[in-house]
Regions:
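A short acidic, often aromatic-flanked loop/helix-cap motif at beta-alpha or helix-coil junctions
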Residues: 104-110
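Cap/insert and terminal regions of metallo-dependent hydrolase folds
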Residues: 3, 10-103
Length: 110
């Protein structure tokens, strides 16, 4: 059936790999937004590269980035994370099945 992993407010940690080895993670909801400047935000939010690494470590089938687009928390514009993930999906067809970017107010059925 699979596990839904919710990262909450967390930066990238090595424990994701261990979790991915022990559990069948189907969905990973990862905090990806409000991540600049790194010296301040790295402990609580992942940047895009960190979240992609966490998704790989967790061996999830679907990654859902959260904490982006609603509030201006970091130096990056609020919609920048969505723009970057859309670019990644556009340039890497295999990522379209893995990254599910959910817009504010949008419904995503598991």
């Amino acid at each position: 059936i699979g596990v839904i992993f919710i990262g909450g407010d967390s930066g990238y940690i090595g424990g994701y790999k261990e979790f991915g080895e022990k559990f069948n993670v189907k969905y990973a909801v990862l905090p990806t937004g409000g991540y600049e400047t790194r010296w301040f935000a790295a402990y609580e939010h992942m940047n895009i590269e960190d979240s992609l690494n966490a998704a790989a470590d967790l061996k999830c089938r679907v990654m859902i980035p959260v904490h982006w687009g609603a509030f201006h928390l970091g130096v990056e514009p609020p919609d920048y994370t969505g723009f970057r993930f859309n670019s990644i999906v556009k340039n890497n067809e295999n990522m379209a099945d893995i990254i599910k970017l959910i817009n504010l107010g949008e419904v995503f059925y598991l």
